Design a protein with these regions (language model features):
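Flexible beta-alpha connector loops of hexameric P-loop NTPases
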Residues: 26-32, 69, 80-84, 103-107, ...
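Conserved beta-strand/loop subsegment of P-loop NTPase cores
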Residues: 19, 48-55, 76-97, 144-153, ...
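Switch II of P-loop NTPase G domains
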Residues: 2-49, 57-74, 78, 132-139
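Charged, amphipathic alpha-helical oligomerization/scaffolding segments
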Residues: 46, 91, 115-118
Length: 280
């Protein structure tokens, strides 16, 4: 955009945007009304995708929802996923009688009933499917069917600690995939996917690009560093990122992940009045 603005001699630059809505935190038992309960779940239901911010740094002054100071990303992720699954199980349970009633007039609904029953059983076993049959969901808008980004909030060292990042990525894969998946080598700066053949003929991708085949996106960000970057010029921010061994801000990584997981892309228009990026 800046290059086009220079070419056309305009100062008006309108970038593409992705809107993130900050909803209240989720606690265990939300599906039964604990905490903000149904209000939280309703807020998620209105979103196109879920971005789960997971604390992955140690601090003696920051408490988890259960009052503990020790960081436990695996437990935090399991709490969220469990509540989403329980909410979806209840949704399917409430919907099945309606579909069953309609079966008399529409025998084709038998496959839908079988699918929903199987899906409910899978969720009851604690397994989130890698893919969903949207046609058979009948507009249920299940929470577990939404694409998800796991945003791990790490400390400064975590931005380049490939061992820590690989461990965190394994938590996500083990939590969401029914298959035996081993993460590929992590891209140090997260600037793109690194495809790698698997023994079963499928393709692995780097930890920060796990959206294919139902896998989530994984992004590592240091919120403390991001707050510093907001106060700096572009040149100063670039220099600070270089000091930490990364080439892209966490905010930029998150935007790219959101575009990828939602299947969005941008096209540009330019002229003497403005340069604009459009989202499609």
């Amino acid at each position: 955009l800046n290059v086009l603005a220079d070419m056309y001699g305009t100062d008006k630059i309108i970038p593409a945007t992705v809107e993130f809505v900050d909803v209240a935190g989720l606690v265990a038992g939300a599906s039964q009304g604990e905490g903000l309960g149904n209000k939280f779940l309703a807020n998620i239901r209105e979103c196109d995708a879920i971005c789960h911010v997971v604390r992955a740094f140690e601090s003696s002054t920051i408490l988890r929802a259960d009052g503990a100071t020790k960081t436990d990303p695996k437990s935090d992720i399991e709490v969220i996923n469990t509540e989403l699954m329980l909410a979806d199980i209840a949704t399917i349970e409430n919907h099945l009688p309606k579909v069953t009633k309609e079966l008399k007039s529409d025998p084709k609904l038998r496959s839908t009933i079988d699918y929903l029953t199987s899906l409910q059983s899978q969720l009851l076993s604690g397994d989130i499917p890698d893919s969903f049959d949207d046609e058979k969901l009948h507009g249920l808008d299940l929470l577990t069917a939404k694409p998800i980004i796991y945003l791990f909030n790490v400390d400064e060292n975590g931005l380049t600690d490939q061992t820590q990042q690989a461990e965190l990525a394994r938590i996500v894969i083990n939590t969401n995939s029914a298959g035996d998946v081993v993460p590929a080598r992590l891209q140090q700066d997260g600037n793109g996917a690194s495809d790698k053949p698997r023994n079963d003929g499928r393709t692995e991708r780097s930890q920060e690009s796990l959206s294919p085949a139902g896998y989530p996106q994984v992004v590592f960000i240091c919120a403390e560093l991001e707050s510093q970057l907001r106060e700096l010029s572009v040149i100063e921010a670039t220099e600070l990122l270089a000091d930490y061994g990364v080439t892209e801000s966490g905010l930029a990584k998150l935007a790219h992940a959101a575009y990828d997981i939602l299947g969005l892309q941008s096209y540009l228009t330019a002229g003497p009045k403005e340069v604009r990026a459009w989202t499609i």
